[in-house]
Amino acid sequence: MFLHSVNLWNLAFYVFMVFLATLGLWDVFFGFEENKCSMSYMFEYPEYQKIELPKKLTKRYPAYELYLYGEGSYAEEHKILPLTGIPVLFLPGNAGSYKQVRSIGSIALRKAEDIDFKYHFDFFSVNFNEELVALYGGSLQKQTKFVHECIKAILKLYKGQEFAPTSVAIIGHSMGGLVARALLTLKNFKQDLINLLVTQATPHVAPVMPLDRFITEFYMNVNNYWILNARHINLTTLSVAGGFRDYQVRSGLTFLPKLSHYTSALSVVSSAVPKTWVSTDHLSIVWCKQLQLTTIRAFFDLIDADTKQITQKPKKKLSVLNHHFIRHPAKQFEENPSIISDLTGTSMWVPVKVSRWSYVAYNESDKIYFAFPLANHRKIYTHAYCQSTMLDTNSWIFGCINSTSMCRQGVDLSWKAELLPTIKSLTLRLQDYPSLSHIVVYVPSVHGSKFVVDCEFFKKEARSMQLPVTHLFSFGLSSRKVTLNTNGLYYNIELLNFGQIYQAFKVNVVSKCTGSKEEITSIYKLHIPWSYEDSLTIAQVPSSTDISLKLHVAQPENDSHVALLKMYTSSDCQYEVTIKTSFPQILGQVVRFHGGALPAYVVSSILLAYGGQLYSLLSTGYCLEYSTILDKEAKPYKVDPFVIMIKFLLGYKWFKELWDAVLLPELDAIVLTSQSMCFPLVSLILFLFGTCTAYWSGLLSSTSVQLLSSLWLALKRPAELPKDIKVMSPDLPVLTVVFLIVSWTTCGALAILLSYLYYVFKVVHLQASLTTFKNNQPVNPKHSRRSEKKSNHHKDSAVQSLRLCANDAEDSLRMHSTVINLLTWVVLLSMPSLIYWLKNLRYYFKLSPDPCKPLAFLLIPAIAILGNTHTVSVKSSKLLKTVSQFPLPLAVGVIAFGSSHLYRVPCFVIIPLVFHALCNFM
């Protein structure tokens, strides 16, 4: 039936939309670097010792447990409590296991062994029963309260110890990080119980999929508390995102709110973390060896030697985190580093007067100081740049104040350096150091190892170039190019007009080298100055290297910085940089940032088609095919202008006051604008994707009904069309009451699913009856739709008595097809709470709180009546004219209020369905 109404042009359009959506999905799920994380290994068998909690607590939280992680002899020793280390609590996230603590716990244990257990950490982990808290937010508050009790229980294990801790450090993965932040919102919680919070791939800004009001309210409470109490929160917090490999939680959601008066929070993407430099997926972030090593190094540097616990000094905490996660100078962390260093001993001093210098050190027996006098260089150049391939942690570059060619003391400039994968580098603006007479590079004595030191002086203008990015709608057909003609070591390319999340580019760097036959490495670093989301690309030159340019966080309105492509190059090579728009990556950004809103646009399109069918039934007496009416009615100009107009009017104070007076919720478009997520044409693109999805879902549901009806006819004797229409069949009240009882006593989503299956059964039965009727009737061309319209116009006696004919059955099936599509999305959006309930059935028979219960009490009776509804009874209703007007404003409402709050979408669906059901009685 559905296939007969397919228009080839429309079909081609929908196929094209599928192609575009596939490009975007491919970029999200496959368009990133390979997994470069090293696996972390346990050298001894991991053990999880269950911590006994008070019986009252276990009764209140029967599904939750607390464990202590250990290995080998450490695990054996600590089976006899109390403990003597530094407590760290790991909180797993959505569907996460308490055993995920083993990677970081094992690395911390090995580090403690290296220092003979001078300090060591005790890693605890909470078992949340792998609850799906990203899908159902009703248990988040319960988890938060349990963690509070766990912290108190952990600290009791250290009672009586000489250096007993008074607080714990928390590492939270995914939603576990949000639960940790929520601790501060508890009435009886003391903030001093947490000394450090590290979150990994935690969506702090908003839920990934707001599928129920509980998760949205939880986010609102947590974020509002942190914003309103920012001055009083002295908890040092680090949020680490996974980058583009993490398609479950996009990195933009992990950035903590930036408040001018709250400076104890850092947010960084793993690709920008020194000594990590890789993107991680949502699960590998807990076992990625590079990242866990960085985390543990920071933890050990945070220890206060006097208390043998994590320091209570906020300034030191931030210094340590900046050192390890933001900018690493290739030196061991020191709280108060000595700026002045002694340059003494029997070292050789060599003056260097050239502007470009390179030294290859191999089997050096003597220490050498290379001194670069600055007097002449200051007249010509603005900057000095040095790099070394020796990646040890010793000081290697100094500044002399003496005017002579050698000095006894120098300013240690090594703290200004930056560690990169293959080099450590330092760039100095000479005017910032007017008192320096020399720059001194120190080359230690080495045996058996080889490294290279390079230095050069340059003018900023010669090494800084501007490269305007190509236009969004160039679709990769045009490009812009810049050539690095000078043979320098370091270049800055300013990427002008690049600062929006919808922008995406492909950069190609071609290097051509002469002279050296040795393997040469170049580093290309994308630096985003308004957020720590840098990424590095290492290339062996000569080569042609592609780099993807796209953002996790848009540039703030008041930020004037420019994104940079920093190039650490070889003086033997020339480089050509080409940039062009990447259309597939733009589609990927649309899917990445707005894919979660697609169900709202799908339902909006179906509602428009539904309204068109009701109006067709009112005006012509028959119902159009779903695909035909979808093509006719699902137009973006029926929805978007209203949303844009409302958003515009909300900018006026009088309209905003009126809006608040009638208690309307905040417009979703305003929420997206506040998160810098609104960009041109995104609503149009999403509407087209939504209409395309509605079309293919309609095709799928229609095909499924026909297949099920064929199966029905194969298994059962042929059914007949009912001779009398009975909206209230004898079994209807019983089924309705049963489903309502199921909803009240177990789970609302379960009752909705059962009602949906009942409705599908009724439609399949009607389809089977119609098929049987057609197979048994001779083909008679006189009985056409036109003749039926004529008979309807003359109020034929069969219609007057509401006799159901084959054409009326076809009309009913067309209407049922649309209703099934609407109900399918309602069921899909309610499924998360059902899955959560099924998973926790052994602990709780009744889901509480239940986000779907109010919806179920309205939807179940409506579905029961609609299952027995035929168009012949609806089109004679006085209520039909009013009902046919509902879907259009509701389609607007779905986009206005449901695109960022998906749990509201079923509420807009249920209204026309209830009134449609009432048409049988009015």
Curated annotation (Swiss-Prot):
Similarity comment text for this entry: Belongs to the GPI inositol-deacylase family.
Region Disordered: start-end pairs: 776-798
Known role: GPI inositol-deacylase that catalyzes the remove of the acyl chain linked to the 2-OH position of inositol ring from the GPI-anchored protein (GPI-AP) in the endoplasmic reticulum. Initiates the post-attachment remodeling phase of GPI-AP biogenesis and participates in endoplasmic reticulum (ER)-to-Golgi transport of GPI-anchored protein.
Short name of any one Pfam family annotated for the protein: PGAP1_2nd
Biased composition (Basic residues): 782-793
Transmembrane segments annotated in the record for this chain: 12-32, 598-618, 642-662, 669-689, 695-715, 734-754, 818-838, 895-915
Domain of life: Eukaryota
One MF term in the entry's GO annotations: hydrolase activity, acting on ester bonds
SUPFAM superfamilies: alpha/beta-Hydrolases
Gene3D superfamilies: alpha/beta hydrolase
A biological process term (GO) from this entry: forebrain regionalization
Main location per the UniProt record: endoplasmic reticulum
Gene Ontology CC terms, in alphabetical order: endoplasmic reticulum; endoplasmic reticulum membrane
Segments on the Cytoplasmic side according to the record's topology features: 1-11, 619-641, 690-694, 755-817, 916-922
Sorted UniProt keywords: Endoplasmic reticulum, Glycoprotein, Hydrolase, Membrane, Protein transport, Transmembrane, Transmembrane helix, Transport
Membrane topology summary: Multi-pass membrane protein
Residue numbers on the Lumenal membrane side: 33-597, 663-668, 716-733, 839-894
Sites carrying sugar chains: N363, N402, N558
Localisation: Endoplasmic reticulum membrane
Record note on disruption phenotype: Homozygous knockout mice lacking Pgap1 show otocephaly and die right after birth. However, some survived with growth retardation. Homozygous male knockout mice show severely reduced fertility despite the capability of ejaculation.
Catalytic residue positions: S174
Catalytic activity, EC: 3.1.-.-
Protein name, entry field: GPI inositol-deacylase
InterPro entries: AB_hydrolase_fold, PGAP1-ab_dom-like, PGAP1/BST1, PGAP1_TMD
